[in-house]
Swiss-Prot record:
Predominant localisation class: nucleus
Enzyme Commission identifier(s): 3.6.4.13
Gene3D superfamilies noted in UniProt: P-loop containing nucleotide triphosphate hydrolases
Residue ranges constituting the Helicase ATP-binding domain according to the UniProt record: 38-224
Catalytic activity: ATP + H2O = ADP + phosphate + H(+)
Domain of life (superkingdom): Eukaryota
Species of the source: Kluyveromyces lactis (strain ATCC 8585 / CBS 2359 / DSM 70799 / NBRC 1267 / NRRL Y-1140 / WM37)
Gene: SPB4
Record-given protein name: ATP-dependent rRNA helicase SPB4
Coiled coil: 497-558
Residue span(s) of domain Helicase C-terminal: 248-404
Length: 596
């Protein structure tokens, strides 16, 4: 079932204003998942919905929620104070915000003469506390709540909020919500809601949730699985490029400079990698080595919520060519118009996330392309591994046409500020830890990782001291770990930030003073030792050496004479010799202490 259908063919009636809203938003036809889900979820069925990314799952649950809410309003005039009707939970703030925006877009067409329907977004922000959410809930009396698990749980636990009237709950990206990171909060929330309710689970990879599905309190759920020859939509092509780690940055710059796209999302493995490469590639842009009209954005989970929302809104509404550097915080569910290229510098630790990342492009039957970089060798086995999950990848080759003298430019940029040197090391260490936790460890083997190649990708001047590197790549480590020649004088390598540099110099001075004190103390100890003690020490050592020599000579003579003494006895003599030597040494040391 791959073709789109007319809204006239929907097997249930929907409100005229909802139909107007759908057409005004440009959804002239419905997708298979919408045609299958809306009639079931609008009625009295719990649903488990699995469909490829970009297939319209959000609208498939928003319309039933609105339909059920309108029926409830008609039957009970209006909801009691402190009660709500529907709850939608998503794993990220960005996705929750997007779902809330979709609901608000529908409500723009809601008739003014009817009792107002309102929605409220519940996500943690630095500017809004749970108390602020409660005040807004009390004042506006919304019937639909949309939020992330932690904030929703905090909200529902307040005495001002009553859950008895909640008739519908939706878990969007349900497999993520039911994994170990969110499972406890989600199960607690579900236990607080009425048992007589409608529950909907939605995801592109719902099967990975396994037995956890049965803990959501559904009653005889209907599974809606839209069949496809691939886990990705037909409008999306997924390709891989085999490239050594040291050339990954050059390949990325080649694609950004030469590939035609309107919007591109580049996925990095860690938050610090995003900020690090965002800063450096902006530097290349200032040098006119990246196309001038390309606008860069960065987004990751360590940013404040308001900053994340603002960045996402800016990237979404940007009219010129734009690139978003991000982590998996922007991998699930987020619908950004006009994204026609997705680049993954490294495969994610979870194969399901790979599908979600790719699904940010090729949405709603638009043409999209997803690329993933794989290291030469073992990592190429990732391709057949994904085929088992019904994801087919085609190899692609790209001629490197990035930036000349890139390594020198990279190192010069780092040498301009010691903070960048620190940043490069932290980014490298974070990646090492990330790679070591890969779930497909049979493919992404930590011990066979190209530690030096990855270090070159991150522009490292010197390898950090890490047990992982010492254990698996000791033979690859250059002298003192330096990857540049000549080595950098770390005593004079300064921070641009005056306060940080002042603190560094102070610490350097303190360390020098401590070192000088230790050196002076050692010299004084040697200098102040009594001449008689020195003589006794020398004489004791000479006596031990002489005794050892006599014993050794006696044993050697035994062996030469061929005495009938067994090998065990000879070995025992050697052991006695060593034992006596240790005992004398111990007694000598003990005597020195006793004399104090």
């Amino acid at each position: 079932m791959s073709k789109s259908l007319s809204w006239d063919d929907l097997k249930c009636e929907i409100q005229p204003w909802i139909r107007t809203a759908i057409e005004s938003m440009g959804f002239e036809t419905m997708t298979p998942v919408q045609a299958s889900t809306i009639p079931l979820f609008s009625g009295n069925k719990d649903v488990v919905v699995e469909s490829v990314t970009g297939s319209g799952k959000t609208i498939a649950f928003v319309i039933p929620i609105l339909e059920r809410l309108i029926k409830e309003e008609a039957n009970s005039a209006k909801f009691k104070k402190s009660h709500f009707h529907s709850l939608i939970i998503s794993p990220t703030r960005e996705l929750a915000s997007q779902i809330h925006d979709v609901i608000e877009d529908f409500l723009k067409y809601y008739p003014d003469n009817l009792y107002p329907i309102r929605s409220q977004l519940l996500v943690g922000t630095s500017s809004a506390s749970v108390r602020d959410d409660i005040n807004s809930f009390t004042d506006n009396r919304p019937q639909i709540l949309v939020g992330t698990p932690g904030r929703v749980l905090d909200f529902l636990q307040k005495t001002n909020v009553k859950t008895a009237s909640c008739g519908t709950v939706v878990l969007d990206e349900a497999d993520k919500l039911l994994d170990l990171n969110f499972q406890k909060d989600v199960e607690t929330i579900l236990k607080m809601l009425p048992k007589q309710r409608r529950t909907g689970l939605f995801s592109a990879t719902i099967e990975s949730a396994g037995a956890q599905i049965f803990k959501t309190g559904m009653r005889n759920p209907v599974k809606v699985a839209v069949k496809s020859n691939s886990s990705a939509p037909s409008s999306l092509s997924i390709n891989y490029i085999v490239i050594p780690p040291k050339d990954k940055l050059q390949l990325l710059l080649t694609l950004l400079n030469n590939y035609r796209f309107k919007k591109c999302i580049v996925y990095f493995p860690t938050c610090i990698s995003v900020t690090y490469f965002y800063a450096f590639i902006n530097h290349l842009k200032e040098l006119n080595l990246i196309q001038d009209d390309l606008k860069l954005f960065s987004l990751h989970g360590k940013l404040q919520t308001q900053s994340r929302m603002k960045t996402l809104d800016s990237f979404t509404s940007n009219l010129t060519d734009a690139v978003l550097f991000t982590t998996d915080v922007a991998a699930r569910g987020i619908d950004i118009p006009d994204v026609d290229l997705v680049i993954q510098l490294d495969p994610p630790t979870d194969a399901d996330i790979f599908i979600h990342r790719c699904g940010r492009t090729g949405r709603a039957n638009r043409i999209g392309k997803a690329l993933v970089f794989l290291n030469e060798g073992r990592e190429e086995d990732y391709v057949p591994f994904l085929e088992v999950k019904n994801v087919k990848l085609e190899e692609e080759s790209v001629e490197l046409k990035g930036v000349e003298n890139l390594t020198k430019i990279f190192h010069d940029w780092i040498l301009h500020d010691r903070a960048r040197f620190d940043h490069s090391v932290r980014a490298y260490v974070a990646f090492i830890k990330y790679y070591s936790k890969h779930t497909a460890s049979s493919i992404f083997r930590f011990h066979s990782m190209d530690f030096i190649g990855v270090a070159n990708f991150y522009g490292l001047l010197r390898l950090p001291r890490m047990p992982e590197i010492t254990r698996y790549a000791a033979d690859q480590i250059p002298e003192e770990g330096w990857l540049v020649s000549p080595p950098v004088n770390l005593d004079t390598f300064a921070y641009l930030d005056k306060q940080k540099e002042k603190a560094r110099l102070q610490e350097l001075q303190n360390l020098k003073q401590i070192s000088d004190k230790k050196k002076l103390k050692s010299e004084l100890k040697k200098k102040n030792m009594a001449w008689s003690d020195k003589t006794l020490t020398k004489e004791a050592k000479a006596e031990r050496r002489a005794a050892m020599a006599i014993k050794r000579k006696a044993i050697e003579e035994k062996l030469l004479r061929g005495d009938e003494e067994s090998e065990d006895e000879v070995e025992q003599d050697w052991k006695d010799l060593v034992r006596q030597n240790k005992k004398k040494k111990h007694n000598s040391m003990q005597g020195s202490f006793d004399d104090l």
